[in-house]
Amino acid sequence: MKVLHVYPESDQLIQRHVTMLTDGLRQSCQVYTACNPVSARQQLKQLDPDIVHVHGCNQFFLLRTMRSAGKMGIRTVLTLHGQLEPWVEQHQRTQDKASRWLLLKDTVSHAYAVITLGRLERTNFEKMHWNRRTEEIHNAVITNATNAQEMATLTFAIYQKVIDSNTLEQMDEVSTATLAAILKAGIMGDRRWVSELPNTSPDWRRLLIYAEQENIRNYVDYGINILGLQTPMLDTSRIEAYFPDNYLKPKPLKEVIGEYQGDENEYILRIIRQIERQPLLLHLIELTRELYRDNVDDDKLTEMLEEKNLLGFAGRLMQVLSEQVLLDEGYMPLDPIDDKQTEHLRKLLTNHLKI
């Protein structure tokens, strides 16, 4: 893990904090520092860090660094260092233009995590409602309530939490292809349905964490067993992560739309309608299981979909199912559609865990 710390060289207290923190972090990750705009810009491009940790937010180059990192797909952590406390904030607002204040708010809201250095600072910041992903770590430079090693340990735990969030965004093509094959095996219960697997090993940690957060770990574990793959021991239920503000762990379809009532076509129609409302990978998997059943009447189902104005969406859904869970074309009740609206559906699925 590579972490770039960016701080203002003019603030001696922050500089002491960064020095103490980075000294404690060196055993856990690769740490780099930048204390001016030129160095921050150069290292951001050269290092391609996993995380950019910005200290303070009252200088424009700090905000610009955070925004540049975000555009590059690099996750950011912000330690406030008291710079948004009410007494500081009021003075700042009288000096700053409204546009700069809005820029500050927008930048802080997009940080993966905001670290406050005490209970009062955390309470005051939370009242602003700028970012719900707020943490509290005391500053060992100015208090005996903690020490340098504990401060570093708690900070690294936040870094790990950031890295373990929305792992789909960080997965490579091998990992996503392996996941699709695993899901196909998990759905069918027979490795003969999977034609081939990638030759190289996937990023198992990210893959398994993603499965946990999408509540598909049971399908993934079964598929791994069917394919005879070797994976690391990882209790993903205990791994912490950050989620979007509106995130709820996906529930099985029976808890959302009710149980199967004996009419397969009607049940599939209900599933497709639910997926149109909220596309979730878990529900795509459950739909695929139903499409492989013998009692699906393709012609009747197509008529029912047309009556409910779901024919176009269902066609796009078939295309996405062929990619996400390798649904065979012979089991699609209608032809797949691949257009701009299909791409929108892909993005909704991809961005489910996006901060």
PLM features: residue spans?
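N-terminal subdomain of nucleotide-sugar transferases
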Residues: M1-P37, Q149-T153
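Active-site proximal beta-strand in glycosyltransferases
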Residues: V3, I51, S68-P86, A113-I115, ...
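Short N-terminal targeting/anchoring amphipathic segment
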Residues: Q43-L62, R75-V77
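Membrane-proximal helix-turn-helix segments that form the acceptor-binding/catalytic region
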Residues: K97-A113
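A short, active-site helix/loop in glycosyltransferases that binds the activated sugar's phosphate group
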Residues: S109-R133
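C-terminal alpha-helical cap of glycosyltransferases
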Residues: I137, V141-I142, N147-E169
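Conserved NTP-donor binding/palm subdomain of two-metal-ion nucleotidyltransferases/polymerases, i.e.
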Residues: K161-I355
